[in-house]
Amino acid sequence: MKIGIPKEIKNNENRVAITPAGVMTLVKAGHEVYVETEGGAGSGFSDSEYEKAGAADRCRTWRDAWTAEMVLKVKEPLAREFRYFRPGLILFTYLHLAAAERVTKAVVEQKVVGIAYETVQLANGSLPLLTPMSEVAGRMSVQVGAQFLEKPHGGKGILLGGVPGVRRGKVTIIGGGTAGTNAAKIGVGLGADVTILDINAERLRELDDLFGDHVTTLMSNSYHIAECVRESDLVVGAVLIPGAKAKLVTEEMVRSMTPGSVLVDIAIDQGGIFETTDRVTTHDDPTYVKHGVVHYAVANMPGAVPRTSTFALTNVTIPYALQIANKGYRAGCLDNPALLKGINTLDGHIVYEAVAAAHNMPYTDVHSLLHG
């Protein structure tokens, strides 16, 4: 199979969908790999490294990468990339379609086979292709939150770890999954007063065992969320419902916070969990202030640490890409239930129910199309 790797064009998106080692894996399996010129530069990979690994040396433009049978990316396509959509194109990337109506309509209209990293799901409910980026974003969330709590960045001037005789900063993390757990690790490491909320009592027990008395765990409900948000210096939104939006923090709750507090919405690429995160920001202009509260809503947080992120991402995506390339998407997905859950669009239909619901568009069962 011909596999294309275009250069990411989203603002400050320095990750790339494949490392030279990944190229070598695919080439050794008999596939052709086309990496756009300087596609890996942001992650520290040169064109010559890709060529030595077996990538075609004649790929120079977006067009060359996008004309492949399968395109591997990191982030959802931007409007100027829609021109390369065509029936049967396999697009394997983070799609986050529930929060991207324009992208959804484009892949449906052009009958693109849209396979989303974030909805590939194992039998135990875990999301193996989302996990590494959730780890990165979770750890970054408290780092950037601490930075924007500084007065020169619009914050209230709080040091999260405090100093002797001065209270520590209060951090609330909504969601105790991978991102939330990693946020807590950094918060605890900085010496902050950390509270984690989750709807799963068993998960709260696990977090209590993991962190002991270094964190407070609370059952997530509207009452506890409102109380914690009001008292916090930094709130991290780390809730993900695969393929869907999850607005948990109301505008009224945000209004109750003291001026200069900070919200970091890790889930903004899926629509976010705060009613007041009404826009997506960029690494160039990462924050805005609403009701006196600093909002950080960068949709590609791991793009700021591309070297780490690219290795972490491709470690988990390449085995699935190899399965698609070896068997084709139909057989590959039918043979692997986890990969089957990754299909969001197929033959002009939305086949992931949460995406269809998010845009009030028709839903079609994927099996009826794959077996048709």
From Swiss-Prot:
Complex formation: Homohexamer.
Ranges in coiled-coil conformation: none
Upper lineage: Bacteria, Bacillati, Bacillota, Bacilli, Bacillales
MF term (GO), any: alanine dehydrogenase activity
Binding site for substrate: 15, 75
Temperature note: Retains about 50% of its initial activity when heated at 85 degrees Celsius for 5 minutes at pH 7.2.
Pathway linked to the protein: Amino-acid degradation; L-alanine degradation via dehydrogenase pathway; NH(3) and pyruvate from L-alanine: step 1/1
Name of the gene encoding the protein in the UniProt record: ald
Keyword Nucleotide-binding assigned: yes
Family: Belongs to the AlaDH/PNT family.
Signal peptide: none
One GO term (biological process): L-alanine catabolic process
Compartments where found: Cytoplasm
Protein name: Alanine dehydrogenase
Active-site residues, as the UniProt record annotates them: 96 (proton donor/acceptor), 269 (proton donor/acceptor)
Record key words, sorted: Cytoplasm, NAD, Nucleotide-binding, Oxidoreductase, Sporulation
Transmembrane residue ranges: none
One Pfam family cited in the UniProt record for this chain: AlaDh_PNT_C
EC primary class: oxidoreductase
Binding-site positions, NAD(+): 134, 178-179, 198, 220, 239-240, 266-269, 279, 298-301
Known role: Catalyzes the reversible reductive amination of pyruvate to L-alanine. A key factor in the assimilation of L-alanine as an energy source via the tricarboxylic acid cycle during sporulation.
Enzyme Commission code: 1.4.1.1
Catalysis performed (reactions): L-alanine + NAD(+) + H2O = pyruvate + NH4(+) + NADH + H(+)
GO CC annotation terms, alphabetical: cytosol; plasma membrane
